[in-house]
Protein backbone atom coordinates (compact mmCIF):
# COMPACT_ATOMS: atom_id res chain seq x y z
CA UNK A 1 0.00 0.00 0.00
CA UNK A 2 1.30 3.46 -0.92
CA UNK A 3 2.11 5.46 2.19
CA UNK A 4 3.83 8.63 3.29
CA UNK A 5 6.37 8.93 6.08
CA UNK A 6 8.53 11.65 7.56
CA UNK A 7 12.30 11.55 7.46
CA UNK A 8 14.66 13.98 9.15
CA UNK A 9 18.31 14.05 8.21
CA UNK A 10 19.92 15.17 11.46
CA UNK A 11 22.67 17.74 12.13
CA UNK A 12 25.49 15.16 12.28
CA UNK A 13 24.73 13.97 8.74
CA UNK A 14 24.62 17.54 7.43
CA UNK A 15 28.00 18.26 9.02
CA UNK A 16 29.41 15.18 7.26
CA UNK A 17 27.91 16.33 3.93
CA UNK A 18 26.16 13.00 3.28
CA UNK A 19 22.64 14.37 2.64
CA UNK A 20 22.77 13.45 -1.06
CA UNK A 21 23.93 9.92 -0.28
CA UNK A 22 21.10 9.45 2.20
CA UNK A 23 18.47 10.79 -0.21
CA UNK A 24 19.87 8.46 -2.89
CA UNK A 25 19.27 5.50 -0.54
CA UNK A 26 15.62 6.45 -0.28
CA UNK A 27 15.13 7.07 -3.99
CA UNK A 28 17.00 3.98 -5.15
CA UNK A 29 14.78 1.88 -2.88
CA UNK A 30 11.46 3.13 -4.23
CA UNK A 31 10.76 6.06 -1.92
CA UNK A 32 10.01 9.35 -3.65
CA UNK A 33 10.80 12.67 -1.97
CA UNK A 34 7.55 14.62 -2.41
CA UNK A 35 8.37 17.52 -0.08
CA UNK A 36 11.63 18.72 1.43
CA UNK A 37 13.04 21.66 3.34
CA UNK A 38 16.22 22.56 5.17
CA UNK A 39 15.76 24.38 8.46
CA UNK A 40 17.25 25.04 11.86
CA UNK A 41 14.89 23.83 14.59
CA UNK A 42 14.20 26.14 17.51
CA UNK A 43 14.33 24.67 21.00
CA UNK A 44 10.54 25.07 21.22
CA UNK A 45 9.96 23.24 17.91
CA UNK A 46 12.33 20.42 18.88
CA UNK A 47 10.66 20.05 22.28
CA UNK A 48 7.20 19.98 20.69
CA UNK A 49 8.22 17.52 17.98
CA UNK A 50 9.84 15.14 20.48
CA UNK A 51 7.25 15.74 23.25
CA UNK A 52 6.58 12.00 23.47
CA UNK A 53 10.09 11.64 24.95
CA UNK A 54 9.79 14.55 27.41
CA UNK A 55 10.03 12.34 30.53
CA UNK A 56 12.86 10.17 29.18
CA UNK A 57 16.38 10.68 30.57
CA UNK A 58 17.82 11.47 27.13
CA UNK A 59 15.31 14.25 26.29
CA UNK A 60 17.56 17.23 27.12
CA UNK A 61 20.50 15.80 25.14
CA UNK A 62 18.20 14.98 22.20
CA UNK A 63 16.90 18.55 22.06
CA UNK A 64 20.40 20.04 22.33
CA UNK A 65 21.57 17.81 19.49
CA UNK A 66 18.59 18.52 17.24
CA UNK A 67 19.08 22.30 17.55
CA UNK A 68 22.89 22.10 17.16
CA UNK A 69 22.72 22.64 13.41
CA UNK A 70 20.42 22.53 10.40
CA UNK A 71 18.29 19.51 9.50
CA UNK A 72 16.63 18.37 6.28
CA UNK A 73 12.98 17.38 6.72
CA UNK A 74 11.35 15.28 4.00
CA UNK A 75 8.12 13.53 3.19
CA UNK A 76 8.81 10.20 1.53
CA UNK A 77 6.13 8.37 -0.44
CA UNK A 78 6.03 4.80 -1.67
CA UNK A 79 4.84 1.27 -1.08
CA UNK A 80 4.95 0.53 2.67
CA UNK A 81 6.96 3.75 3.14
CA UNK A 82 7.00 3.65 6.96
CA UNK A 83 8.46 0.14 7.20
CA UNK A 84 10.75 0.60 4.20
CA UNK A 85 12.20 3.82 5.65
CA UNK A 86 12.80 2.15 9.01
CA UNK A 87 14.52 -0.79 7.30
CA UNK A 88 16.75 1.58 5.33
CA UNK A 89 17.66 3.56 8.47
CA UNK A 90 18.66 0.52 10.52
CA UNK A 91 18.76 0.15 14.30
CA UNK A 92 18.72 3.33 16.41
CA UNK A 93 22.17 2.41 17.74
CA UNK A 94 24.48 2.34 14.70
CA UNK A 95 26.66 -0.28 16.41
CA UNK A 96 23.68 -2.65 16.16
CA UNK A 97 22.56 -1.55 12.68
CA UNK A 98 23.00 -4.01 9.82
CA UNK A 99 25.75 -3.28 7.34
CA UNK A 100 24.44 -1.24 4.43
CA UNK A 101 21.83 0.67 6.43
CA UNK A 102 21.99 4.45 6.71
CA UNK A 103 22.92 4.41 10.38
CA UNK A 104 25.58 1.72 9.97
CA UNK A 105 27.16 3.70 7.14
CA UNK A 106 26.78 7.32 8.29
CA UNK A 107 26.06 7.48 12.05
CA UNK A 108 28.51 7.56 14.94
CA UNK A 109 26.44 6.97 18.06
CA UNK A 110 22.97 6.32 19.41
CA UNK A 111 22.67 10.09 19.91
CA UNK A 112 24.19 11.27 16.62
CA UNK A 113 22.45 8.65 14.50
CA UNK A 114 22.01 10.57 11.22
CA UNK A 115 18.27 10.17 10.64
CA UNK A 116 14.81 10.13 12.19
CA UNK A 117 11.91 8.25 10.68
CA UNK A 118 8.27 7.90 11.67
CA UNK A 119 7.63 4.66 13.57
CA UNK A 120 3.98 4.18 12.58
CA UNK A 121 1.49 5.36 9.98
CA UNK A 122 -0.36 7.41 12.62
CA UNK A 123 2.85 9.08 13.80
CA UNK A 124 3.87 9.68 10.18
CA UNK A 125 0.63 11.59 9.61
CA UNK A 126 1.17 13.71 12.75
CA UNK A 127 4.86 14.31 12.07
CA UNK A 128 4.25 15.33 8.46
CA UNK A 129 1.56 17.79 9.61
CA UNK A 130 4.02 19.24 12.15
CA UNK A 131 6.37 20.37 9.37
CA UNK A 132 4.27 20.62 6.19
CA UNK A 133 0.95 22.24 5.34
CA UNK A 134 -1.36 20.11 3.20
CA UNK A 135 -0.89 22.53 0.28
CA UNK A 136 2.87 21.74 0.29
CA UNK A 137 2.19 18.10 -0.46
Curated annotation (Swiss-Prot):
Its EC number is 2.7.4.6. The lineage of its organism: Bacteria, Pseudomonadati, Campylobacterota, Epsilonproteobacteria, Campylobacterales. Belongs to the NDK family. NCBIfam families: PRK00668.1. GO terms for molecular function: ATP binding; metal ion binding; nucleoside diphosphate kinase activity. HAMAP family: NDP_kinase. It catalyses: a 2'-deoxyribonucleoside 5'-diphosphate + ATP = a 2'-deoxyribonucleoside 5'-triphosphate + ADP; a ribonucleoside 5'-diphosphate + ATP = a ribonucleoside 5'-triphosphate + ADP. Homotetramer. GO terms for cellular component: cytoplasm. ATP binds at residues 10, 58, 86, 92, 103, 113. The gene is ndk. Keywords: ATP-binding, Cytoplasm, Kinase, Magnesium, Metal-binding, Nucleotide metabolism, Nucleotide-binding, Phosphoprotein, Transferase. PROSITE patterns: NDPK, NDPK_LIKE. PANTHER family: NUCLEOSIDE DIPHOSPHATE KINASE (PTHR46161), NUCLEOSIDE DIPHOSPHATE KINASE DDB_G0292928-RELATED (PTHR46161:SF3). Major role in the synthesis of nucleoside triphosphates other than ATP. The ATP gamma phosphate is transferred to the NDP beta phosphate via a ping-pong mechanism, using a phosphorylated active-site intermediate. Its cofactor is Mg(2+). It is found in: Cytoplasm. This is Nucleoside diphosphate kinase.
